[in-house]
Amino acid sequence: HLGRFVPDTLRGYLQDEIYVLGGNIVYAESLLARFQSENEYDPRPHLVGLFHDIGDFTDKIRCEYYDAMSALLEENLYRPLSDWHEARGMQFSTIATWGRQSMLGQTYQYGDIFRMCRWFHITGNEDPGHTEPGGRCFADAKLSSSVQHLYERDRAAMCVYWGSGHGMTQEENIAWTNENYAYGLNMYNTHGGLYGSLGSWYEWVPPSVHFRQPYWEHWNCFTQHVSRLSAILSQGVHRADVALLYPLTSVHANWLKGDHFTAAGDEVEMEGMALAQQIYTSGIDFDFVDDLKLNEATVNDGILHIDELEFRVVLMPPMTTIRTDTLEKIKAFYEGGGTVIAVSHLPGGSAEHGRNDPRIRELLTELFGIPASSDYIHVVGRSTQGVSRVSTQRHAGGGQAIFIPQPELHSNVWYDPGFSRTKDDTSSVIAAAIERDVVASGGVTLSEAGDIYHTHQRIDALDVYFLYNV
């Protein structure tokens, strides 16, 4: 009915909160055929392992089944929707997906959040409610901007501040927006403007940002600021210190059914998200990186190149399970002069062979000098009365592999004057290992200097930094 308006009038379609799996596990003949062709065995005798622990084989059947399921979702739903719009000169976009602020939620809704989001021409997320500065939807914003950077999109959008009340001020509006832009977003979308007075009767997510507000006469000042900022930050290539591996394989290996995950899966998410926020708020920017893009990367002079992106550190969050080719790529980065840092728990299993995979133990030994987290022994420096829990192994090619068995997400104060302790939070370890992109004068971290968030775009020969003081 509207074909004559495409694409001149209708330039795109923006989906809101698409439902796909809702925790359901797909079973179909086409999925079985796909699984058998890729993995060369019949999964049916092992499908009980999707719901119950069946030993070392558990991780293998879960990872391979969910990978095949996610691939078919991408080929039959996520990509065709994008292709349909592109063939008609339109953009396919989102500003709201389910599983908010949660790796586990993203997975049980979509199987693989990267396989879905990489087909949006504009990706994005919601950011509702009223918070203090520094309290916006960090994890969702960083995921949206990471997909934009990895898959070479121009825009990452936000649908913002609904539910914050009609009393939301312009001071709050600009502070929250600057924070989101520091996370890498670059397209502002307020939630709604209701022109009928009865609209507020049904509208449960105020404010309605338009002529009813006392700041309406000054609204153009805000939009000019956002327009300029959006125009600048939608250009060029993102520059960040760290590629933070998104631990999808570990999430798949610990997915039981619906929204149920093992305790180990909960730890993967909670510690992984805390790690991401801890390094960012300490002044170290990152992109979440999926297995596909990491395996496409090349290494040159200690730099990991993913297309035009460049990273000096690969950060492995706590993991139970990893793809063998992913760990081999990380090892190649280490041998090529790069810095690899693993935190809290080294993976013991692989997607290809399940738990206790000898190849994973071999690769970990070559990287960190230990085959598993349980084999780590820290060294007490008796001459300095200091305790360093960080283990570092160096390669002849200049690379370094660092294992932090129990990072501190908050500083501890030690009252014994005869005892000193190395600060083992991950941001301090990164800061000591590389020359950071952004530093504060006086040798302090950005968080110590005043909670300064930042993002960096390289636009041709120009370096553009956007800094936000929380």
Feature annotation, model-predicted:
Residues 2-12, 16-470:
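Carbohydrate-binding surfaces of carbohydrate-active enzymes
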